[in-house]
Design a protein with these regions (language model features):
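Extreme N-terminal starter segment of soluble prokaryotic enzymes
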Residues: 2-7
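Glycine- and acidic-residue-enriched helix-capping/strand-helix junction motifs
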Residues: 15-25
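Short beta->alpha linker loops
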Residues: 44-47, 97, 118, 181
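A C-terminal functional module that forms or caps the active site or interfaces directly
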Residues: 184-190
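Active-site-proximal loop/hinge segments that shape catalytic or ion-binding/gating pockets
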Residues: 12
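Short glycine-/aliphatic-rich beta-strand segments at the starts of folded cytosolic domains
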Residues: 168-183
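Proline/glycine-rich low-complexity loops and linkers
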Residues: 78-169
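N-terminal small/polar loop signature for handling phosphorylated ligands or for N-terminal nucleophile
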Residues: 26-79, 86, 107
Length: 190
């Protein structure tokens, strides 16, 4: 039986412009491979709701699991949660449990939970929260889609939270051999 498949959707103008280097794909690939899930596709889209919805619809139809990275922060261009809600045809609003997590976090810091920060408590109807032990603002899962932050430390913590809930197959085992020959010399025997 073949292993389950996964896709990754990286969202952000900062990635496509070269201002920020994506560090999450390599990490996710390693984690999924170790869990017996084959990462088959990665797409990077800009901060545009139509582009996010189109990519998400295609990926979730073709793969067992989709992981998104980016676009769930407090700024005006963080539109991933809205796009995911649109893709699933559900409402989105500030959810009490997400708000309580953020309120407790900002109370501990002595910082106000302002309108911008409250945007991070907007969760599509029917989604379950993904724990964020790094900076509190939760990600969420809906259907076969797991929506995570783009900040690498937060992304990694969210992957650690979600991975045990995914059904894996046979992990890929590999070994590296160093050969002091050019590829053209060894291509035939391979």
């Amino acid at each position: 039986m073949p292993n389950p498949t996964a896709a990754m959707l990286v969202i952000g103008d900062e990635i496509l412009s070269g201002r920020t280097r994506d560090a999450n794909m390599h990490f996710l690939a390693q984690e999924l491979t170790g869990h017996g899930i084959d990462l088959r596709e990665v797409r990077i889209v800009h901060d545009d709701a139509d582009a996010i919805v189109a990519a998400l619809d295609a990926l979730r139809a073709d793969h067992d699991t989709v992981v998104t990275s980016g676009g769930i922060g407090p700024t005006h261009d963080d539109i991933t949660a809205d796009a995911v809600a649109r893709a699933f045809g559900v409402a989105i609003d500030v959810r009490d449990d997400a708000r309580a997590i953020l309120q407790a976090h900002y109370d501990r810091q002595g910082t106000a939970l302002n309108a911008a920060r409250l945007r991070m408590a907007r969760i599509p109807e029917g989604a379950t929260l993904i724990d964020n032990p790094v900076s509190a603002a939760p990600g969420f899962s809906i259907g076969n889609v797991h929506v995570m932050a783009g900040v690498p430390a937060v992304f990694q913590a969210m992957v650690a939270s979600v991975l045990p809930t995914l059904t894996g197959g046979e992990p890929l085992l590999s070994q590296t051999l160093r050969v002091q020959r050019g590829e053209g010399d060894i291509a035939g025997p391979l």
